[in-house]
């Protein structure tokens, strides 16, 4: 099976690094998916969520305010100005990281419809856990 390695890095450090099945990125021209063996690409990313699917078909999400994606030879590297990995071992930790993610995206998004759609998608992924 072909592998796809994802790394998400901010000026504060690494937020995520693991092998994944696929990833959906918030490109400047719209969302796009990346699978193993994707063509090489560099893209500007807008404020939104990165939807990460692991080999067990579970989804994780990382909210970013903006950044760049470099896709090359089975590896996706995201350089983001700010990122929040929405995760937690308890309901309160998960709710806290979700609130941080909402604030991060809201601080960068001037489009209220896009912001509402992004928040709804984030909440749906969290509920599905």
Swiss-Prot record:
GO terms for molecular function: ATP binding; proton-transporting ATP synthase activity, rotational mechanism. Keywords: ATP synthesis, Cell inner membrane, Cell membrane, CF(1), Hydrogen ion transport, Ion transport, Membrane, Transport. It is found in: Cell inner membrane. The keyword Ion transport applies. It is a peripheral membrane protein. The keyword Ion transport applies. Pfam families: ATP-synt_DE_N. InterPro entries: ATP_synth_F1_dsu/esu (IPR001469), ATP_synth_F1_dsu/esu_N (IPR020546), ATPsynth_dsu/esu_N (IPR036771). GO terms for cellular component: plasma membrane; proton-transporting ATP synthase complex. Produces ATP from ADP in the presence of a proton gradient across the membrane. HAMAP family: ATP_synth_epsil_bac (MF_00530). Belongs to the ATPase epsilon chain family. F-type ATPases have 2 components, CF(1) - the catalytic core - and CF(0) - the membrane proton channel. CF(1) has five subunits: alpha(3), beta(3), gamma(1), delta(1), epsilon(1). CF(0) has three main subunits: a, b and c. This is ATP synthase epsilon chain. It comes from Campylobacter curvus (strain 525.92).
């Amino acid at each position: 099976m072909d592998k796809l390695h994802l790394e998400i890095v901010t000026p504060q450090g690494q937020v995520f690094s693991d092998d994944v099945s696929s990833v959906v990125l918030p490109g400047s021209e719209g969302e796009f998916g990346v699978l193993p063996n994707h063509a090489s690409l560099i893209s500007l990313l807008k404020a939104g969520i990165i939807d990460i699917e692991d080999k067990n078909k579970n989804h994780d999400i990382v909210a970013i305010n903006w950044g760049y994606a470099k896709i090359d030879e089975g590896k996706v590297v995201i350089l983001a100005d700010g990122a929040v990995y929405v995760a937690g071992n308890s309901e309160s930790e998960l709710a806290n990281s979700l609130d941080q993610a909402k604030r991060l995206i809201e601080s960068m998004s001037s489009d209220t419809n896009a912001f509402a759609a992004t928040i709804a998608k984030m909440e749906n992924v969290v509920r599905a856990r």
